[in-house]
Amino acid sequence: KMYEELSPETREFFDFMMEGDLFDVFARPHKQVGGYMTYLPDYHAPFIFANFNGTAGDVDVVTHECGHAFQGYISGKDPIMEHSDITMETAETHSMSMEFFTNPWMEQFFGSRAGDFLKSQLEDAVVFIPYGSMVDEFQHRIYDNPELTPDERKAVWKELEQIYKPHQDYGALAFYAKGCYWQRQHHIYSYPFYYIDYVI
């Protein structure tokens, strides 16, 4: 109902996805972890993969990945395949926007607790902006100074935490307290310089 009411284009898109069985979103034993959208050019179709577990995170994932998929569905109609291949700088614009475009329908998922979800979503977005910016600045500093030792890299992270997240207190988590929290961010390893795109 949400995508049906959002716009005629999203209704057409979601019907296409459902009719084509283009979602694999329910968790099952031995299923690969993660959530993503990929485009299947031979079929002119987006495909969404996820692992729903009955939490509010499922709504975050489906709205986010449907943002990617809707972009793929719309641009995939162009007969020149290269036109549908968007840049890294714009890829997350569609997905992050869709998370907020669908807010008027959150009562369908959360009933009387929709306000709690929306408040949490806004808090997460506000907290994420400095964190995403910090990850990006960290990468620039590291790549601009490849000779930095592991301890110097940790010192850079700690310095940036004082700027972007001065409230951060790791308590007894000594590993993170000595500047190692960045190692949790797989984008730094797998997709360098992509993280700022979630903030744009």
Predicted regions, residues:
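Cation-handling catalytic/transport regions enriched in His/Asp/Glu
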Residues: 1-200
